[in-house]
Amino acid sequence: MDIWQACTGAEQIIPLRGRLVRLVENQGQVATLQLVDTLEEQALLEQLLETSKPPLPDAEKSLHYLLRTPFRYPPLRWGSRFGRRHEPSLFYGACRLETAMAEAAFYRFVLWSGMLEPPPSGRILSKHSSFEVRYRVQRGVRLQLPPFDQHREALTHRSDYRTTQRLGSAMRGAGVEAFEYPSARCPEGGVNVALFAPAAFSEKQPRNLQPWLCETTADYVAFKSAQTPDTPRLFGLELYLVDGRLPQPA
C-alpha cells in the first residue's frame, strides 16, 4: 500500500510546530563508572569511547547530546516504524509524557521477552529521564488527521512496519522535515512525533529534565518519579499482546 500516493501527500505538507517529550534510559556514564576505579579513569574511558563513535556533522555539534544522539547511530536491525535499515535514523518523541511512557514500556517488555532467563529477583530496575524540546518546520505532515487517518490501521500496526517504512521513505523524498502520527502503543490514543533531521529543533537544549525509576517484570512495567512521592504509572503486558503474544518489531 502506498499511503503517500493515495493521500496525495505532497498536497498535505504544512508548517508544523510544537513540543515533544522523549523518555530515555540512563546508561552511559553509569555503565562506564562500573568499569573503572576512579572518576579520572572514567573521564579517560569516556574520551576513548567518544572517538570510536560515528563522527558528528558540524550542524549537530552545538546540540545537547540528548538531542543529537538519536541521529548519530544507524537504525536497529529491523529499522524503525518510519525508517528502513539503510536510511538515517529519525528522532522519535511523543506529544505527552504518558504516550512516551506507553511506547517505552513496550520496548521494556521486548527486552524482557528476549532474555534467556529472567533475573532471580523477577524484575529489572532501571533509571530513565524524560525531557521536552520544541520543534518547528515549514514542511510537516499530520498523519493523525484526514486524509491519512483512514489508514490508521496500517499506521499503527503492532508488528508490520513495511507500509509505514515505505511512507517514511516517501516523506523523506518529498522533503518533509517532521511529522506527527498516532501512537500504536498508547491506550489513550496518543500522538507521536518524528523528526528527520536536527534542523527541525527550534532550540539546542532540552527542557524540563525529570528523573524516573522503572520496574520491569513479566506482567507489568511501572514508572515512578525519582523526585516526588508519586503514584507509579503502570502498563500491563495485556495492553501490548496480539492474539495472546507480544509482537516483535519487524
Could you tell me what each predicted segment is?
Residues C95-R96, G175:
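Generic detector of short, well-ordered, non-transmembrane alpha-helical segments enriched
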Residues S89-A94:
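A short, exposed loop/beta-hairpin motif centered on an aromatic-Gly-Thr core
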Residues R96-L97, A184:
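An acidic- and aromatic-residue-enriched active-site/binding cleft used to recognize and process polar
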Residues M1-R84, F109-A250:
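Active-site and NAD+-binding cores of ADP-ribose-processing enzymes
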Residues T99-A105:
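Contiguous mid-protein beta-loop-alpha structural module that forms a pocket-lining wall or clamp
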